[in-house]
């Protein structure tokens, strides 16, 4: 289908956005009354014992916010997002231009106000109201110790077991527990930071510039505007190695060789393919930081420096799609951002689509369809557990005041979002035209935060012939239905190119489900050549058919040590689920072993669900495993596991 091309819908002035009026019930801040222009952090990290009291671990220093008043009538107070774990000691207002003789510096009163269980408001009162369009700086002296935004790890929670480690995790609303801010994805600013660390430690941040300033100080600058949730810091015993012209890996010294081996030369190929499809990579560097094993996520797309789980060091480059996913966020999420967390699908649905476009070009359609089929299976699993009509199974989630956006996290924005973007590509009917559209979309909305309306209006402007046809209101596929009706996606992309890989896996699973497995037929299937996702797909089918007839799981494990003794986390997760679903108690230790080796939420929670849904022995295993590993898990993951072990109202 011929496109009108970007020229006809591109005006020199930026279009007015629906998102300019969007509310964010998860922020206590006055982000519509002030524009944040720049943030500077000046922090000193201290590793001591946990808890309050002198000498305890914490970050001490200052946050300086450069702001401009947007209200025509001026303003007499400013509200920032903060948290009870932040102790603000002083607030100073700097009026006039920096370096100006007339610059006024005055201490200003401040107080906190309750907001929700995940944050509070920090209210700064101006002695003299600021005028419309006035620029000023606010300097806050503060300290943060224990809290949800800054994660302190004892040496035993790291890979090297020798030195402590600290990192921050901002998404979704945790950076208010790192520094006072407008903690909403609706607004963006540049930032800089000066971080002082103890001897023998290195600091890294999500910034385009990294400089050593003396033995223990590091300076960072992010020259592109980003939302607060993407500002990230990590401090530990870190080494680095170059793996491409604009990429290096960072990791603890004991992991650096494995990290280099796994990713040397491959990242540039992913980046270059992304640029061909979606336009220039604007962030300068793309580095990877391999986190300690307790890191709860697969990856966090902090710009310039993606934080990733060490589970990706599979030794065979088989989990590189996670890196492709995080790289895809460089365009979708980091450059064009959801304006509030109810629109999370704009970040994740597009990123899944982009990841699978890159993967199709590099690894072929069969492999990508197979990977997408495992994603679809996860969505099916989620909807079976939560109920299709659950309001969280809409693309646009209504987040109620007081609800932590993190608690709405599930597969829907990823996989149903992917289906919606695929449906829009299907309406266009020409992959090349849709790729061009995505490039134009990124260019149109770069460095901005948007709502679904902004995107869909642009789509219909770009393809006027589709607008004329009324594709937004085709019965059963209405855009409004996609966004606001819970349940299974109305359209599923065709994954049949993956049949050549899926069919053999389905047939093999069928053989293992027989009460008397035909070992001759089973041994005729050479799984030694299968890629990881083919094995994952096979295990998903085995799990669906479980419990298998008695003795079959034991035999399956003996037949395929490649699966039952795998080091690959995706295989270990599914083997653990199969062990539990079949109550194969002699291998229960493998579940505990896996949960002790890492703390990724995506692997941890399903195994606790499986243990608590299993036999008495399995439930005992859950409690024993949790008491052995709780101290090494992220606080959010601890809370979720506790809810599985003792559901509210039980």
From Swiss-Prot:
Key words of the record: Acetylation, Aminopeptidase, Hydrolase, Metal-binding, Metalloprotease, Phosphoprotein, Protease, Secreted, Zinc
Substrates-to-products reaction catalysed: Release of N-terminal Arg and Lys from oligopeptides when P1' is not Pro. Also acts on arylamides of Arg and Lys
EC category name: hydrolase
EC numbers for this chain: 3.4.11.6
Residues that coordinate or bind substrate: 298-302
Binding positions for Zn(2+) per the UniProt entry: 325, 329, 348
CDD domains assigned: M1_LTA4H
GO terms of biological process kind: negative regulation of blood pressure; protein processing; proteolysis; retina development in camera-type eye
Modified residues (Phosphoserine): 7
Family: Belongs to the peptidase M1 family.
GO CC, alphabetical: external side of plasma membrane; extracellular region; extracellular space; Golgi apparatus; plasma membrane; secretory granule
SUPFAM superfamilies linked: ARM repeat (SSF48371), Leukotriene A4 hydrolase N-terminal domain (SSF63737), Metalloproteases ('zincins'), catalytic domain (SSF55486)
Name of this protein: Aminopeptidase B
Modified residues (N6-acetyllysine): 446
Protein function: Exopeptidase which selectively removes arginine and/or lysine residues from the N-terminus of several peptide substrates including Arg(0)-Leu-enkephalin, Arg(0)-Met-enkephalin and Arg(-1)-Lys(0)-somatostatin-14. Can hydrolyze leukotriene A4 (LTA-4) into leukotriene B4 (LTB-4).
Cellular compartments annotated: Secreted
Residue numbers annotated as active site: 326 (proton acceptor)
Family matches, as SMART domains: Leuk-A4-hydro_C
GO MF, any single term: metalloaminopeptidase activity
Domain of life of the source: Eukaryota
Cofactor binding note of this UniProt entry: Binds 1 zinc ion per subunit.
Site (Transition state stabilizer): 414
